[in-house]
Amino acid sequence: GYHPSNSLVLVAIKEGTVSMAMRVDYPVAENTDAYDLLAHHIKLDGADSALMIAYVPTEANQPYESGAEVLGYLAISLLKNQIQIRESIEVIADRWRSVICEDISCCPPEGNELPDFESSRVAAEQVMHGRTLPFIDVTELADSIAPLPNIGSEFIAQVESYFVHEDATDLNEKQRDGATAVVDLGQLYEAGRGNSDPDLVAQVIGRLSDIQVRDYALGIHSEETLDAYWAMWKELLRIAPVGYVAPIASIFAAVAYESGQGALAHKALDRALIDNPGYSLALLLRRVFSAGWPASAFIQMREQLHPKVKAAI
C-alpha cells in the first residue's frame, strides 16, 4: 500500500487477526450512508472488531469535520453492526492521539509525535519477508506498476507472433500451448529465476490474448505460490506492449486484491481499462472490488471456477 493522507482508514479484525483494511477519502460532511457502507463491508468479511484511523486534512479553507467527529460517526455504524471498537486514532500532520484513551499522560490533547516507520520493527519484518515498504503516496504506488520505457521492437514482434486469433483452426492447440507456457514461466519464478527466458515471457504475454488462457492463468496460483506469481504478473504488466496489457493487469489486480492490496488492485484495473476501455474482466473486477467483496469469497469463487476452465483447455 501507501502512506495515507486526507483519509479515513478502517482495519477489520477477525478472531484476533487483521483480515482486511479499507481506505476512503476523508469525509467533507456527515454522510451516514457512507459510514454504514464501510461497516457493512467489514461485517461481510466476518470481522468482530475494528481499528479506526482518521488522517485529518490540514487545509484550513475546507469544511472538514474534526477527526473525533468522523471517528464518532463511524463508531456508531460499527456498533450497529455488532462490531467492537479496538482503537480509534486521530492523526493530524505528524502527531497522533487515541480519542478513546482517557489518560492524558499517554494521549495528551496535542497528541504524540508519529514514530519513524522505516526504522520500526514492523518495517524490518516486512523487509525480512521480502515485502516492499508502503509507498509515500498513491502516485508512487501507481508508478510501481507503470510501463517500463524502451520496450524493444524485437520483443514486441515476439509477443505479436503469439497472438491468438479466435477463429484460428488450431485454436485449442494454441490455448493448451498458452496454458503450458504460463505454468512453465510460473515455475521459473518459483525457482527464483524470474524472466530468464525472454521468449517464454513473450509467449505468455501473447497467448494471454485468448480468454481461455487468461482465465486459466487467473486461477493457477495457490497460497504457497502467491508471492512468486505476484512477482511474475507485476513484471509482465510493466513490460507488456500496448494492446496486451489488459489481461495481465486484470490478473495482477485479482492477485493484489487477494493479498489485501485493494488500492494497488484498483490501480492495476486503471491500467487495464486504459489499454482496453471495454475489457469485460476488468469492468467485472471493478464492480466486485468496489462492492467490498471479502478476499476469501473471491478466492473461493476463483478456485471453484478453475477446474472448469482447465477441463475446457
Question: What positions do the PLM features span?
Answer:
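N-terminal basic/disordered segments at the start of proteins
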Residues: 1-13
